[in-house]
Amino acid sequence: MNQQHVNLAGIGAGPFNLSVAALLQKCRNTRYAFFDKKPEFSWHSGLMLPGAKLQTSWMKDLVTPVDPTSPYSFLKFLVEKRRFYSFINAEQASISRQEFAQYLGWVAQQLPAVQYNAHVREVNYQQGRFWLRFDDRIV
């Protein structure tokens, strides 16, 4: 069975682990990986009701509170998608859950450390380390 060593591993690709993965991009000497059993990114797909708003400020995106100059900020997402000026002109205090899900997906697509179709079968702690077992490898 193939073995891979990382300094940090995360199980799941939700907002918390996406935030950690995005912030770790600047840490060149840290080997890390995040594993999600889903085939691609999705966030609360069953809760994307029309008009549903995020209950927190868009300023609390994945990176801005820690690194406001990060290329993974919500503002960078708006610029990339050519929606910055319409967003600013609308003076939106809150954003839709659907737009935030699009932002999360945009970030997820840019993070090579996030692996999909990676179902963790077992987690063990041995010899001072955690070991994650998959069907085809151990991390």
Sequence positions of predicted segments:
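Generic structural signal for beta-strand residues in well-ordered domains
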Residues: 1-3, 25, 113, 125
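N-terminal Rossmann-like FAD-binding beta1-loop-alpha1 element of flavoenzymes
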Residues: 3-33
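A structural signal for short, well-ordered beta-strand segments and their strand-loop junctions
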Residues: 33-36, 115-117
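Short glycine-/acidic-enriched loop or helix-start segments at secondary-structure transitions
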Residues: 20, 44, 125
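Feature captures the FAD/FMN-dependent oxidoreductase FAD-binding
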Residues: 74-139
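Short, solvent-exposed loop/turn segments at secondary-structure junctions
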Residues: 15-16, 39-41, 121
